[in-house]
């Protein structure tokens, strides 16, 4: 019934098992990959024909984590998985980025990759298994694909690199780096680090690439055993005569257009030339080329003109040298009522970044496969259409926005204090108001300044820079600092580095071509370091270190410690006491099981009042102290007196007066306020009071 094929590959200390032929047989290809007790089903479906008029490659990647993978039932009313989580969205991008460049140019057939986590041992992140499964499924699908690729996660501890570290190992690691690539070349890097050097980061990339080689070889053997024939697909033949004619007519004008430094004016001029080209060659007559073909060839010539100018040593599009950073303007405190704000402008890229401080209850609840936890640091990135002069839909964040927000977060997270050292929930929002390349790195810079403006005690300022590469087949290449949007689009590499003056905190690399050597990566990292230090110097002119106090607009945080036995008194029956406290003082009160109390107030006065009330409720009677108390009950043998909220003591009849007391009500009555002295507190917390000794004192 099944033609099941299995392949086992030794991958470091793990065994990777690939299986096909039993599950999802109607898909173009399906592979179940297993590492330990983690199992991920990856399916690939490709259409044999492209849709008419298709002018882009419709690749879709979906990654989904099923709660049954860890033996849990989803929460919520519907009890089923909902829209993709941020983690799932980020993993979709992680899979998409290294495979997309390996499909041939001109391939417009729809391809969908679906990776489903069906079992998880909660020991390691399933994303590496999903990447491996995607590579294997594409390799046996027959779809044109220049793979396979391998993938590895790399940690770093005590001067040693760790291949595919577990969650517990990552918690103690100074690095979390994912690298993917083919046998000869690295294609993608995603990482966060604790201020490591450029050499340590490059070493991690090369270590991961070396360690994945057995995996790549194993997938090749697996594909050979499956034996699927590659599709008989050939790209459409290019009209070289037409291309030469367009080049002769428009190459020089395009070169002139790309000397216009202002983005919108340059786009307008290139648009005019494109329209003129279409009008001249796509005449609509019999035998004349279609407009789409003319536009495509015009775009190729445009790309070659810009690239040739770069590698031949001419000034860049905006007139800069290869290693020059655009003009920078930094401001803090730009928004009056926010807790912290910054305006960061670098050339035609601009971000307004805000930092908001909240209480512990404001933390984001994360329900993940490896377990639930609270996130006390959030960074959200918004890219509205107006930032590039366009109209468009504004709504929930797209994959790109989620990815850029996470990259910016990785860049600054290493310098943000722990929640134990700074017990606030922090939300940062980066609003991109102008964009012409490197907006995620502008978000890193703006975030660093906004947090310092809010009084968050960062260990060091952080800056980010995007690097680019143009590499021609003849070996000539140029590494570009602080790339423009056009340089990103027309170049061969997008290389983003964030860090402090001491080291790298985040690195993201996407390479569109093979043949990026260690020498090129080293040059890019060193050039990025110089650019980062320059940007930090410009940022320091606006704010060089965190303010000594949190913003006046931020909630005041006061902490105190109470006896854990008194927690129930603060909470009260059914939460009545703490509800009244929060409503009457306007403060948020968080109480830990160990008696730690955190009070967040809109003003210092409100927070002080809440502290006073809590101390009043939790105060313990001090032997020898005199209190004014209210008589709550009168009995034959004395009276009960409330000396503090929730605290009563017994005033025995013998302690009311010096003379013999026959009748208690001759001296005290219910509701009366009297002075009493605490004589003793026994082991059970019972308090003995004296009225006569209070009078003597």
UniProtKB/Swiss-Prot annotation:
EC code: 2.7.7.8
GO biological process: mRNA catabolic process; RNA processing
Subcellular localization: Cytoplasm
InterPro entries, alphabetized: ExoRNase_PH_dom1 (IPR001247), ExoRNase_PH_dom2 (IPR015847), ExoRNase_PH_dom2_sf (IPR036345), KH_dom (IPR004087), KH_dom_type_1 (IPR004088), KH_dom_type_1_sf (IPR036612), NA-bd_OB-fold (IPR012340), PNPase (IPR012162)
Cofactors required: Mg(2+)
Keyword check for Metal-binding: yes
Protein name, entry field: Polyribonucleotide nucleotidyltransferase
Species assigned in the record: Alcanivorax borkumensis (strain ATCC 700651 / DSM 11573 / NCIMB 13689 / SK2)
Taxonomic placement: Bacteria, Pseudomonadati, Pseudomonadota, Gammaproteobacteria, Oceanospirillales
Gene expressing this chain: pnp
